[in-house]
C-alpha cells in the first residue's frame, strides 16, 4: 500500500521513518512532569563573575566601531565544554587580552583622528566631534577637560558615569600619560584603558548579604544587566538603568513591572529567548 511504499522509499534514502516518529515521543510527556513547581531543587547559584558572551561583545563591537568594523575583531568565542554559550569560565588569556587592547586603541584613535599639516591641526572626517577637542593643542587640557573626556568614554563604553574613585584614578592616569608620552598618546591610551575595565569584559552576579538559606539577592545594577542579557545582546538601556537608580528593582514587584515593560516593547529585539531554547535543547 501507499504507507508501505513511503516507508520503503524513506528507508532507501536513509531517512528512517520509525526513527523520525520517535522524535515526537517527547511531545507526549506531560508538561507538569517537566516543569512541576513543587519539585524544584534548592537554589544553587553561588556568586560568580563570567565573561561576556561573543554575541554581547559583537553587538558592542559593531556599535563602537561603526563604519570601521573590519578593523575591530571579536576576541570571544564559544567554549564547547559548556551547554550554554555564556556560561564559560571567566578566562581571558593573552591572545584575548591582546585583541581587546588592539580594539580599544583602534576605536580611540578613530575618535580622535587628526593630522598636523604645516603646523595646523586638522580633524579627520572619521573623528568624533565630541572627542577631538581633547587632543587639539589649541585648547588647554585642563583638569575639567580630562574629567569630561573620561566621563564621555565611560558613557560610551559602560553606559554609565564613572564613580568618584574611578574618575579620580583616570584623571591622574591621564595627567601622568600626557606628561610621559605627550598629549595625543597620553589622552588616547588613558581612554583606551576604559575599554579594558572588568565591567566592559565581564558580567558580575555577586549579590548582597546572603539570607539564612545562603541566597543573596542581586544588587539593582546587577539585576539590570541580568535582565538585559537574558533577553538581548545589548548592555542595559535607559529604562533598566533608570529603574536600578530609582529603586524599582529592589523588590519582586518592581522587577516584574520592568520585565513586563521589556516584553511589551515591540521595538526591543529579544534574540536571547530563541537562543536559550536552542542551547538548552541543543537545537540549532
Where are these regions (language model features)?
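Low-complexity, glycine/serine/threonine/alanine-rich intrinsically disordered linker
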Residues: 1-284
